[in-house]
Amino acid sequence: MKIYTCKLMIFLWVIGGLLVAGCERKEVMEYEGVDGIYFDVQYGASHGNESLWARQNYTYVSFGTLEAEEADVTMKVGISGSIKDYDRPFRVEIVQDSTNAIPEEEYTGFTEEQVIKAGENHAYVTLKVFRTARLTHDTARIQFRIEPGEHFTLPFSEVGQIPGRWNDTKTQFATGGDPAVHDVFFNNILQRPLGWGANEY
């Protein structure tokens, strides 16, 4: 029995050595080319976290469920490609023909000039939106579009399911799904909660 165990151990060592010798070390190729940039806004269930939430095509602020007269909106912009050791500016513009929100009255605090800072792979675009009288019967919309500049390109026409993230993209408002574009919708209309019948509302 002892000889059998010894032969088995030798056999396993020989097989292990052959497997290791058969391995070939390959270098991981570095990304080459212009890095991509896109809106990577995420939100979802409170029991999750940002790394798991699905990518969303729009942000919705419902003043009907808030007591506040204003709300902060944060939109994450991500990159595909390499992290750099220097700042990389880009622009975000408001698409006027797809926007009906009134500047300074219904939103403020937005800056077109943005930057992906050195050592980072994302940035946050922020603004503040306000409750106004017309929002009790109308929905305001602001459409934002990325202008990539010299450091980035817009390589995607759409972004599908991102591995490791939940697949619960919201569809209450129709959007084109272009990752270079993000819409912000806000109103003061109380929506019927999911699961409520018409006679309970």
Where are these regions (language model features)?
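Bacterial N-terminal signal peptides that target proteins for export
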Residues: 1-10
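Generic alpha-helix detector with strongest preference for long hydrophobic helices that associate
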Residues: 4, 58, 108, 118-119
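C-terminal motif of bacterial Sec signal peptides marking the signal peptidase cleavage site
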Residues: 19-22
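Intrinsically disordered, low-complexity regulatory regions in eukaryotic proteins
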Residues: 24-111, 124, 128-201
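Short proline/glycine- and polar residue-rich coil/turn motifs
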Residues: 114-122
